[in-house]
Structures are given as structure tokens and as C-alpha cells.
Amino acid sequence: MASSMISSATIATVNCSSPAQANMVAPFTGLKSASAFPVTRKANNDITSLASNGGRVQCMQVWPPLGKKKFETLSYLPDLTPVQLAKEVDYLLRSKWIPCLEFELEEGFVHRKYSSLPTYYDGRYWTMWKLPMFGCTDSAQVLEELENCKKEYPNAFIRIIGFDNVRQVQCISFIAYKPKGY
């Protein structure tokens, strides 16, 4: 009903607009032709002209899948020396993470014994050695606790984890000790 209430004077004003007013903005004429720009493409279909490493790398051997159990981060490396362990713990402390020691007496490697659900990343549950080391500022304290755990459980896998108490997540985890034969 509102459309029927427009006066005839308004209709006359709309009809009086000149064609010059409708063309005040220049129309979009599109992008420029690609032929206006110089072409610098190399017309070579030879596959050997693609990226190369200069022939420095030939065939690389893959990691043998048999007899190599995966434990934790850095498990593909040889066992860490006490100096290397101290450097890892120093990194953990510099990152403001809380060090904690955990041990496992049966299977220190990844398995799906308890659950195949994706709720826990590998189905393992480790026992905590004492409490997390809140307030620890020196890697020697952590390594001393590692030695105490080794004396108490010589046949256990022992790992050091770094816990971020702000985000409440485990940020780092690596094997610090493996029993003989692993």
C-alpha cells in the first residue's frame, strides 16, 4: 500500500534525470591484455632442467624397520651421555617447563595393550617417580633424581618430561635411561 501513496510530483522528478547524469562514473573496462606485458618464460619442456641438488646426494639408505623399537623423542639417536642429558634438561628449564621423571617396568616402547582408542597417544601409562620438580632450577638436581631412580629400578625405562603448568600440557619427553639389552 505504501507504493500507491507516492505523489505524482515524485514520479515526475525521477523521470526528468538526464542521460548525462547516469554516465558520470566511467564503466569498468576490464584487465589489460596479457600481450601488453613482456614474456620472460623459458620454453623448455626438458624435465632435467627442473630443480637439482647438484648431484651431491645419490641414494640414501632408509632406517631399518626390524629390530628398532620406537621409544620416545630422540629414540633414533644413540643413548644420550650425562652431558647431553644435562643440556636437554637445561633447555627444558630455560623454557620454564617443570621437569618430571617417569618410569616403566614392562614395555618402554609404543604399544596398544590397554586401548586402541585415540584418547591417549600410544596406550602407555608410566609411573611417576616422586612428584614433579616444581621450583627446580638446576639440571644437576634432575640428573641426581635420575640416578636415584636407576638405583631403585635398574630394569626400568626412565624418561624425563617437561610439563608446562600454564598451558597444562606435556611439552617434551625423551628417554633418559634404557635397561641393558635395549
UniProtKB/Swiss-Prot annotation:
Pfam families per UniProt: RbcS, RuBisCO_small
Keywords in alphabetical order: Calvin cycle, Carbon dioxide fixation, Chloroplast, Photorespiration, Photosynthesis, Plastid, Transit peptide
Cellular localization per UniProt: Plastid, Chloroplast
Presequence boundaries: 1-58
HAMAP family per the UniProt record, alphabetical: RuBisCO_S_bact
Role description: RuBisCO catalyzes two reactions: the carboxylation of D-ribulose 1,5-bisphosphate, the primary event in carbon dioxide fixation, as well as the oxidative fragmentation of the pentose substrate. Both reactions occur simultaneously and in competition at the same active site. Although the small subunit is not catalytic it is essential for maximal activity.
Protein name, UniProt field: Ribulose bisphosphate carboxylase small subunit, chloroplastic
Natural source organism: Gossypium hirsutum
Lineage of origin: Eukaryota, Viridiplantae, Streptophyta, Embryophyta, Tracheophyta
